[in-house]
Amino acid sequence: MREKGPAFEHPQQVSIDVSAGTVEVHSNDGNGKEKVTTEHMKLPPDLANGMLFILLKNLPPGSVETKASMLVTTPKPRLVGLAISAQGEDIFEISSEKRKATHYVVKVELKGITGLVAPLLGKEPPDIHAWILRGDAPAFVKSRGPLTAGGPIWQVELESPVWPHQADAK
């Protein structure tokens, strides 16, 4: 996974090898030099890095709460928990047709001492909100949350394409 560009205060590239239990983080040391951090960790089978929206699309309708894990890098790798719960349905429109999307809230659960101290210091990660269109082929509709630890809240929405009419198309 690569985090680079104006949205990321601390650019980094992360490689995760679950079977070997190896996490490698390439980051900047603050002086322009590359810093490589390698950790050997026991990684859980429910690791959701890079697959959160795929996971949400595959949750059965009516799920009460689902737990998963995520690896965060600051740049030191550490595991956090994800508590995923459906918050009902919201109505939206595509081409003037009303549809319902399941609204999910993903809470990041910090572990250990960090999890105890973060709320006292106002450093709890914000919730991630995601909307998934249910059906035979579930689809991502919208998300709102940070793209990286400590980053700003971003809203990403599905944009319906509009194709030009071509008189000579056959």
PLM segments and residue spans:
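Low-complexity, compositionally biased segments
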Residues: 20, 31-32, 49-52, 61, ...
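Short acidic/polar alpha-helix capping motifs at helix-coil junctions
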Residues: 49-57, 91-95
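A general, composition-driven signal for non-globular sequence regions
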Residues: 36, 51-54, 61, 103, ...
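N-terminal secretory signal peptides
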Residues: 25, 39, 43-44, 50, ...
